[in-house]
Amino acid sequence: MSTIEERVKKIVVEQLGVKEEEVTNSASFVDDLGADSLDTVELVMALEEEFECEIPDEEAEKITSVQQAIDYVKVHVKS
């Protein structure tokens, strides 16, 4: 079983079409990885599907980096 961090990074690579080595914990989806608003919505939807959770819109807006996505999942998803 992959760790939450590995699973989040895999989703980011798949959704944004970036190289795995570009996906660092501090990487911003928009500034560093070139995501647009549609990409970020699709990214949140992929996270919801992977971790079988619902991320409210007001929370999704706060998830702007890889680390924030990892932290959100760790806090809100029962492993």
UniProtKB/Swiss-Prot annotation:
The keyword Lipid metabolism applies. PROSITE patterns: CARRIER (PS50075), PHOSPHOPANTETHEINE (PS00012). Residues 2-77 form the Carrier domain. It holds the Pfam family PP-binding. The modification O-(pantetheine 4'-phosphoryl)serine is found at residue 37. GO terms for cellular component: cytosol; membrane. Keywords: Cytoplasm, Fatty acid biosynthesis, Fatty acid metabolism, Lipid biosynthesis, Lipid metabolism, Phosphopantetheine, Phosphoprotein. Pathway: Lipid metabolism; fatty acid biosynthesis. It is found in: Cytoplasm. GO terms for biological process: lipid A biosynthetic process. It comes from the Bacteria. 4'-phosphopantetheine is transferred from CoA to a specific serine of apo-ACP by AcpS. This modification is essential for activity because fatty acids are bound in thioester linkage to the sulfhydryl of the prosthetic group. GO terms for molecular function: acyl binding; acyl carrier activity. Carrier of the growing fatty acid chain in fatty acid biosynthesis. Belongs to the acyl carrier protein (ACP) family. NCBIfam families: acyl_carrier, PRK00982.1-2, PRK00982.1-3, PRK00982.1-4, PRK00982.1-5. This is Acyl carrier protein. It comes from Xanthomonas albilineans.
